[in-house]
Amino acid sequence: MKQLLNTLFVTSEDIYLSLDGENVVASREQQAAARYPLHTLSGIISFAYPGASPALMGACAQRGVSLAFCTPRGRFLARVCGESNGNVLLRRTQYRTADDPAQSCRMARSMIFGKLYNARWSVERTRRDHGLRIDGARLEQASARIKALLPLVAEETSLDALRGLEGTGATAYFSVLDEMILGEKPVFSFPGRSRRPPLDPVNAMLSFSYSLLAHDCAAALESVGLDAYVGFLHRDRPGRSSLALDLMEELRPCMADRFVLTLINNRIVKRADFTYRENGAVLLSASARRSVLKHWQERKRESLTHPYLGEQLSWGMVPYIQALLLARTLREDLDAYPPFLWK
């Protein structure tokens, strides 16, 4: 099984990355600030503008270390990829499946089922654990609305209709997300989803966490030989990792959303951790990004029992396991893709 190595996050905006022997060197004003052995890293995510040296990019490509560049706000810019893993037959099958609406719908159906299942379970978990602190009736209604969609998703044969069901479920889920935030109101109130730019602290953290999850999903797909840019639910768009977005759908509620709720409800983040721009945008401060990244890595090391495999593994391995199951489904080793159903 793949070993879960470390991910290096570069959050200082003036850091330049280079290669010295077998080490990644982080430099500020041409002075080495830190060194990291390359063999201990599975990925590097830079939120800095200076960039990285061609030598480091080449070494990462050769060794399968994912190197991604994001803006300081967390918006994905680019990723350095080396030679594709796996054989060409798997990718040919992926492309044929993506070009076939019926087969695409079969794959997307499982992913959306997983997303709505996990969204409902997240709501139910809040009802169970914090019944005296929430509006239980509202959460029960939202849970029932999402539950009613699951059999419809399981039988749907149209991609457009499937997207409509997903949207209906997302509306029900986000309508009660504010109830799942247990403290620090009104700073951490959730009026609804906003992006590009996020307009409140909760949306700022959601967008940042989704960027991290998308990177992990893209790296996982590439590691098993799939093309992260050709999806089944999300269609082709230049520069968009469509299959990574597909894969992360089922993981959003349990990996990203619950992570954000934990940060808020455990008072790990505060109002002072955000900057408020004149255009209404709300962004995580540099120190807050470092704190969020630290807790993200800690969360990925926590263990769980995989619902399909029945094996103990870390949360950080979940995208890799799901990517592997997706590849096995495309090879017809499995009859259908088994989504991650959080329990």
Describe every region a protein language model picked out.
Residues 1-20, 29, 35, 87-343:
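Active-site helix-to-loop segments that bind/position phosphate- or nucleotide-bearing substrates
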